[in-house]
């Protein structure tokens, strides 16, 4: 089957400078893909003109006169900017013109507009944001929620686990992913009441529930999926990103300390590059907004051309393998049992 991806070409810190070249790269890799670029036609065409190998016959441009800025309040993005590139791109999914939408724009606005236009799936109380975090196994641990829901009830967390279970099966090809519940300890007696009740509910499902996991388990790859509320998830995500940047800076600083350490850096270059590749956050770019009646992928706002390509890849795999339909079917089965 062919896959059509709608791209908010104006979103993120870099806009068309990143989104359009990344789209062209992706089209060269996948002959079964068509792309809809939404935004300022003049700016989009200027970048396309610099990409002579771009398969123009598989690119459609749709004009949008407004842009959702990274610091725009949700109310302005949702109610006032009705011709924004983000909104028009999401509408393409709503109308069936595209199978998925990818945006590097404002996360809060993307969730709000997507929820308003696409609505949530039957049986899903709240959408959640899920993404993969690098682990020592080199496979990535899928974690959710990452900020959409600061406060959650036990049933919300169970639904997050159910949606992530399908997503990992579809996108990562793991037939029976293991699921961990983030807690302050592995013991069932630990945690607040929400976590304790969630643990009990998850044990009653047919999911491959491992049990409670701690923060270090995320990076060890103890489970394929880690579930938590959006407040905790966002703190973990930002803390891990900050730690990675700090360690990278410290290593660079130490190797530049003297001529001897610079020579050591040359000797250690190969293993260092291997480690860098395994923990490169760009390779894990592309958070999925789960629970909506359409596939929405959130790329990091600062994503470069290389990273944005991975967000497109995630949208492609999710669409090609009917992720949204399979999540919907899972909730139909759940409600009838």
Swiss-Prot record:
Enzyme class: transferase
Gene Ontology MF term list: phosphate:acyl-[acyl carrier protein] acyltransferase activity
Disulfide bonds: none
Compartments in which it is found: Cytoplasm
Predominant subcellular localization, coarse grouping: cytoplasm
Pathway(s) where this gene product acts: Lipid metabolism; phospholipid metabolism
Pfam families: FA_synthesis (PF02504)
GO BP terms in the entry: fatty acid biosynthetic process; phospholipid biosynthetic process
EC number(s) recorded for this UniProt protein: 2.3.1.274
Reaction it catalyzes: a fatty acyl-[ACP] + phosphate = an acyl phosphate + holo-[ACP]
Database matches in InterPro entries: FA_synthesis, Phospholipid_synth_PlsX-like
Alphabetic keyword roster: Cytoplasm, Lipid biosynthesis, Lipid metabolism, Phospholipid biosynthesis, Phospholipid metabolism, Transferase
GO terms under cellular component: cytoplasm
Subunit and interaction comment: Homodimer. Probably interacts with PlsY.
Function: Catalyzes the reversible formation of acyl-phosphate (acyl-PO(4)) from acyl-[acyl-carrier-protein] (acyl-ACP). This enzyme utilizes acyl-ACP as fatty acyl donor, but not acyl-CoA.
Similarity comment: family membership: Belongs to the PlsX family.
Protein name, UniProt field: Phosphate acyltransferase
């Amino acid at each position: 089957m062919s896959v059509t991806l709608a791209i908010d070409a104006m979103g993120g810190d870099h806009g068309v400078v990143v989104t359009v070249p990344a789209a062209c790269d992706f089209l060269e890799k996948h002959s079964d893909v068509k792309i809809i670029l939404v935004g300022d036609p003049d700016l989009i065409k200027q970048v396309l003109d610099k990409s002579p190998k771009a398969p123009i016959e598989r690119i459609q441009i749709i004009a949008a006169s407004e842009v959702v800025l990274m610091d725009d309040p949700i109310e302005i993005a949702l109610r006032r900017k009705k011709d924004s590139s983000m909104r028009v791109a999401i509408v393409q999914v709503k109308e069936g013109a595209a199978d998925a939408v990818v945006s590097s724009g404002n996360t809060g606005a993307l969730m709000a507009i997507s929820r308003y236009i696409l609505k949530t799936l039957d049986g899903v109380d709240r959408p959640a944001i899920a993404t993969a975090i690098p682990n020592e196994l080199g496979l990535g641990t899928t974690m959710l929620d990452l900020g959409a829901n600061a406060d959650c009830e036990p049933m919300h967390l169970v639904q997050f686990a159910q949606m992530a279970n399908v997503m990992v099966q579809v996108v990562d090809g793991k037939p029976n992913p293991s699921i961990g519940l983030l807690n302050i300890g592995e013991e069932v007696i630990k945690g607040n009441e929400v976590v304790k009740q969630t643990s009990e509910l998850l044990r009653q499902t047919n999911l491959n529930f491992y049990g409670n996991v701690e923060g270090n388990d995320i990076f060890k790859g103890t489970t394929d999926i880690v579930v938590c509320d959006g407040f905790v998830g966002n703190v973990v995500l930002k803390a891990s990103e900050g730690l990675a940047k700090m360690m990278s800076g410290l290593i660079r600083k130490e190797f530049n300390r003297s001529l001897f350490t610079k020579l050591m850096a040359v000797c250690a270059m190969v293993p260092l590059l291997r480690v860098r590749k395994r923990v490169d956050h760009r390779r894990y770019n592309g958070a999925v907004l789960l629970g909506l009646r359409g596939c929405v992928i959130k790329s990091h706002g600062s994503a470069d051309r290389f990273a944005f390509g991975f967000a497109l890849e995630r949208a492609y795999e999710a669409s090609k393998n009917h992720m949204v339909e399979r999540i919907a079917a899972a909730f139909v089965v759940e409600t009838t049992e």
